[in-house]
């Protein structure tokens, strides 16, 4: 297997989350360029996430029909074209069009790359391989605001120029030869089996109540401790940094003790940590608890991905696509659910998602009996 293509497979995990978050730190600059407010410029985040999360309901299955290698290459080309449009955009609507195309392209790369990781990884090392991919995704999410801000010292458009170059390079390199080339035509409904939907629902609740509630922590850091924007950002970064560092360890645990166990424990402990971050009176403790939650959120992500990819034979890309779609939809809807609750009672706003994370994923992931072909990874 080409080492370059294998490296490109994991690098693709960085590009998607990086593209989604690259404008988060440069909203004032984007708004100033187009004569709109920073709030209006924030639509560049929604404009990416909506097509990304909604298209993933079907993109994995469609990509499987066309062949993962071909579909991922075309998606990278589309991503590069979209990034060029963003870099040269002459108005906010033009930028939003480019962002929407970026999100649509990433809706194909994310699930198909995950399925490709499962295809090339030895069965006994699936968790570790998915952990490495998850660490790259966490790195993209964590460093996108920093790199976008650095680019904005010259012009925010340079961030999109860099994304163009990376996407074009990944399109040229392609995927490892072991990745399936297509030939099957799985029906869309094959990705919507009851077991997959249970995993997707667990991801919806767990990620919406853990990875998707950084805004709650930011609000508390400002209201309870008086931290400024830069200080709040530094504390919040701890979640992503710990997720990067611990993802490989999480993958090792998946291989040793089982994906189901890791996902359930990750959600339960993550819920407890979130409750502590909403209750305890020390800013240092809150920061430490939030950083630790990054590790346990990765246990949920890697565990769910391993569960679906280790047992789904006919349409793994479609199944993991549905799980990922619901995961990101949970994060997108989290502010709508919990910000109004925070304004009513900050403590309740932390305890409600903490309670949901403690109970719902564990119930949905409760073993329903042995399945044919069950392996240690699926325990």
Mark where each language-model region is:
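Conserved MFS/SLC helix-loop-helix module at the cytosolic interface between two early adjacent transmembrane helices
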Residues: 53-90, 254
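C-terminal transmembrane helical hairpin of 12-TM major facilitator-type secondary transporters
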Residues: 260-304
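Paired small-residue
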Residues: 82, 93-102, 284-292
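Helix-breaking motifs and short loop linkers at transmembrane-helix boundaries and internal kinks
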Residues: 35, 67, 88-94, 226, ...
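Cytoplasmic helix-loop-helix junction between adjacent transmembrane helices
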Residues: 98-137
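Helix-loop-helix hairpin linking two adjacent transmembrane segments in secondary transporters
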Residues: 123-176
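A late C-terminal transmembrane helix in Major Facilitator Superfamily
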Residues: 314-344
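C-terminal membrane-cytosol helix-exit motif in multi-pass small-molecule transporters
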Residues: 164-183, 361-368
């Amino acid at each position: 297997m080409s080492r370059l293509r294998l490296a490109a497979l994991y690098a693709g995990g960085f590009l998607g989350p990086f593209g989604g978050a690259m404008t988060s730190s440069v909203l004032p600059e984007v708004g100033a360029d187009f004569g709109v407010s920073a709030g209006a410029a924030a639509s560049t985040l929604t404009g990416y996430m909506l097509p990304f999360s909604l298209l993933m309901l079907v993109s994995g299955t469609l990509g499987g029909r066309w062949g993962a290698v071909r579909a991922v290459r075309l998606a990278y080309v589309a991503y590069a074209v979209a990034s060029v449009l963003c870099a040269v955009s002459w108005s906010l609507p033009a930028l939003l069009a480019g962002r929407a195309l970026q999100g649509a392209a990433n809706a194909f790369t994310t699930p198909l790359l995950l399925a490709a990781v499962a295809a090339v990884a030895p069965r006994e090392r699936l968790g570790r391989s998915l952990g490495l991919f998850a660490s790259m995704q966490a790195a993209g999410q964590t460093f996108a605001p920093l790199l976008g801000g650095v680019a904005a010292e010259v012009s925010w458009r340079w961030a999109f120029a860099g994304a163009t170059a990376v996407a074009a390079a990944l399109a040229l390199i392609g995927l490892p030869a072991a990745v399936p080339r297509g030939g099957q035509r799985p029906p869309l409904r094959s990705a919507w089996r009851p077991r997959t939907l249970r995993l997707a629902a667990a991801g919806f609740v767990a990620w919406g109540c853990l990875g998707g509630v950084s805004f709650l922590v930011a609000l508390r850091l400002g209201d309870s401790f008086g931290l400024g924007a830069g200080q709040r950002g530094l504390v919040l970064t701890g979640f992503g940094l710990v997720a990067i560092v611990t993802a490989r360890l999480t993958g090792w645990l998946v291989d040793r003790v089982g994906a189901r166990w890791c996902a359930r424990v990750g959600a339960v402990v993550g819920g407890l940590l979130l409750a502590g971050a909403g209750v305890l009176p020390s800013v240092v403790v809150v920061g430490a608890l939030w950083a630790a939650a990054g590790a346990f959120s990765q246990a949920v992500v890697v565990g769910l991905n391993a569960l679906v990819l280790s047992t789904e034979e006919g349409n793994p890309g479609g199944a993991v696509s549905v799980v990922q779609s619901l995961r990101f939809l949970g994060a997108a809807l989290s502010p709508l659910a919990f910000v109004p609750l925070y304004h009513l009672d900050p403590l309740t706003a932390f305890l409600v998602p903490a309670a949901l994370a403690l109970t719902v994923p564990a119930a949905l992931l409760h073993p329903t009996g042995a399945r044919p072909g069950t392996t240690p990874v699926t325990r």
